[in-house]
């Protein structure tokens, strides 16, 4: 009897484990050889919204201002080394905000 009760719980436990596994997997965006986490793009938006660098710093650098922020996520730092950093960040933002470009679900098959 105890064995039947335990086997009846297995499907429920399996579903819970799958949900936990799915929620711990990171979603990545790949573009022009760069691989960044979706979560990093959300942090980038937050950094840009709350940080205004000095006009002197902006004038001295060809890089996007956020490249000078000390809290820039590590996976975004290589983008700053690129000569096309501004356009790459712009494209990554577009991809991150477009559900049809980004599978937000592990089982995603794309938009119709």
From Swiss-Prot:
Role played: Endogenous activator of intestinal guanylate cyclase. It stimulates this enzyme through the same receptor binding region as the heat-stable enterotoxins. May be a potent physiological regulator of intestinal fluid and electrolyte transport. May be an autocrine/paracrine regulator of intestinal salt and water transport.
Record bears the keyword Protein biosynthesis: no
Keyword line: Disulfide bond, Secreted, Signal
Family membership: Belongs to the guanylin family.
Record InterPro entries: Guanylin, Guanylin_sf
Name the record gives this protein: Guanylate cyclase activator 2B
Annotated disulfide bonds: 67-80, 100-108, 103-111
Tissue occurrence: Stomach and intestine.
Cellular compartment(s): Secreted
GO cellular component: extracellular exosome; extracellular region
Maturation-removed propeptide residues: 27-88
Record-linked PANTHER family: GUANYLATE CYCLASE ACTIVATOR 2B, GUANYLIN FAMILY MEMBER
GO molecular function: guanylate cyclase activator activity
BP terms from Gene Ontology: adipose tissue development; body fluid secretion; cGMP-mediated signaling; glucose homeostasis; multicellular organism growth; negative regulation of blood pressure; reduction of food intake in response to dietary excess; renal sodium ion absorption
Family matches, as Pfam families: Guanylin
Originating organism: Homo sapiens
Signal peptide limits: 1-26
């Amino acid at each position: 009897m105890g064995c039947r009760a335990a086997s009846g719980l297995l499907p429920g436990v399996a579903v819970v484990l799958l949900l936990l596994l799915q929620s711990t997997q990171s979603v990545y965006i790949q573009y022009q050889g760069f691989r960044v986490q979706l979560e990093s793009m959300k942090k980038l938006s937050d950094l840009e919204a709350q940080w205004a660098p000095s006009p002197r710093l902006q004038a001295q650098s060809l890089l996007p201002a956020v490249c000078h922020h000390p809290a820039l996520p590590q996976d975004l730092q290589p983008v700053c080394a690129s000569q096309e950093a501004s356009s790459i960040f712009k494209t990554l933002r577009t991809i991150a905000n477009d559900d049809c470009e980004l599978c937000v679900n592990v089982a995603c098959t794309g938009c119709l």
